[in-house]
């Protein structure tokens, strides 16, 4: 469906940040609204790339995820997103993205996380070694439990993904509600996506490839 752009739109904000406003922009977006997979950040970064602007500070002023989207390379992020460590040569992963089409407030997820958090002195996982898949498996999403508390259907999504043949990892993206599954090959991811669409036809489900070539 068509949406009217206003001053809060990331595309308009990006044009203003690099002093290229006004422009006529036609944006075709094939993602659910507020999917939690960086769609708005990617839009802002795309505007900056069109005008050959690679300013980290300008990108960061638009959002913590915009710098990594600007360079569009496999990377680990530090700080609030301004410290990027690129990870070349890790290859690609076949993935399935699934969104149950529920609305989930990022602020509410973080609030729920804060209320659940208990300092236990545990050491953060190491995600700087091994293949792209190993790094993903060794990592974690601390917001997952909080999001499931607010929207239990996210737990259902993860279970459905995890039950698909060839699934190596199922996890929530960011603060949700979109979840992803990593699969051993393109055939497995395609079969999984078709199966998930049959199980839950109301969910948004797409295959994709993550990582650099």
Language-model features, listed with the residues they occupy:
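Acidic, glycine-rich active-site loops and adjacent beta-strand->loop/helix elements
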Residues: 29-33, 61-66, 73-76
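Short glycine/proline-enriched coil/turn segments at helix->beta-strand junctions
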Residues: 17-23, 51-57, 72-73, 166, ...
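Conserved glycine-rich beta-strand-loop-beta hairpin in the small C-terminal domain of fold type I
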Residues: 177-179
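DPxDG-like acidic metal-binding loop motif
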Residues: 35-62, 68
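ATP-binding N-lobe of GHMP and related small-molecule kinases
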Residues: 1-35, 89-91, 99-100
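Generic structural signal for residues in well-ordered beta-strands
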Residues: 23-27, 170, 205
């Amino acid at each position: 469906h068509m949406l009217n752009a206003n001053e809060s739109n990331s595309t308009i904000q990006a044009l203003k940040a690099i002093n290229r406003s006004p422009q006529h922009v036609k944006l075709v977006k094939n993602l659910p609204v507020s999917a939690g997979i960086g769609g708005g950040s990617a839009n802002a970064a795309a505007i900056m790339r069109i005008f050959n602007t690679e300013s980290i500070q300008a990108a960061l002023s638009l959002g913590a995820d915009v710098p990594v989207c600007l360079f569009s390379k496999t990377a680990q992020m530090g700080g609030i997103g301004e410290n990027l460590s690129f990870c070349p040569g890790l290859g690609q992963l076949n993935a399935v993205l699934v969104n149950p089409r529920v609305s989930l407030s990022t602020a509410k997820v973080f609030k729920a996380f804060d209320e659940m958090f208990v300092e236990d002195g545990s050491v953060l996982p190491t995600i700087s070694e091994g293949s792209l898949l190993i790094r993903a498996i060794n990592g974690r999403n601390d917001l997952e439990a909080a999001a499931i508390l607010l929207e239990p259907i996210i737990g259902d999504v993860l279970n459905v993904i995890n039950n698909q043949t060839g699934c190596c990892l199922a996890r929530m993206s960011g603060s949700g509600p979109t979840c992803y599954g990593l699969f051993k090959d393109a055939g497995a991811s395609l079969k999984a996506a078709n199966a998930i669409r049959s199980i839950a036809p109301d969910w948004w489900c797409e295959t994709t490839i993550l990582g650099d070539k």
